[in-house]
Amino acid sequence: MDKITGPFRKSKKSFRKPLPPIQSGDRIDYQNIDVLRRFISQQGKILSRRVNRLTLKQQRLLNLAIKQARILSFLPFTNTESLEKMKARIREARLKAEEVRLKNKEARLKKAKDARLKAKEARNQKKTTLRKIFINPKTSKLNTETSQT
């Protein structure tokens, strides 16, 4: 057989396989959360072996470790980082609204208290006359007294 020469000949360029994402020092373990998070998608799904560029054995160990970490609550079942940020913003907005509501309530209460004090002072300054009506038991007559308070 003749060697094929010309434009159809396949080039023999050397290519270098990219480094695996798990280094020799990294352990695939359910407690090693930093390593496990690299292999979970934004939705919280375990990435495929093709995407991860792992060997079959590494992928199996990784799947088991992620599932164990989820069961033991080291990892969430769904990736909620963006959801947590949104919840934090909502929480902050609610706290600010609550602070404003409390300030308004305090101002209203203070205003009402001041109005009550002014009314009480006005009542104290006003001289009122009270009449006490009673029946004198000795004479069986109706007596009235006026008193200043």
UniProtKB/Swiss-Prot annotation:
One MF annotation (Gene Ontology) recorded for this entry: structural constituent of ribosome
Annotated segments matching region Disordered: 1-23
Chief location category: plastid
Highest taxon listed in the record's lineage: Eukaryota
Localization of this protein: Plastid
Keyword Protein biosynthesis attached: no
Record's keyword terms, sorted: Plastid, Ribonucleoprotein, Ribosomal protein, RNA-binding, rRNA-binding
InterPro entries: Ribosomal_bS18 (IPR001648), Ribosomal_bS18_sf (IPR036870)
GO cellular component: mitochondrial small ribosomal subunit; plastid
A biological-process GO annotation: translation
Stated family: Belongs to the bacterial ribosomal protein bS18 family.
Quaternary structure, from the entry: Part of the 30S ribosomal subunit.
Protein name: Small ribosomal subunit protein bS18c
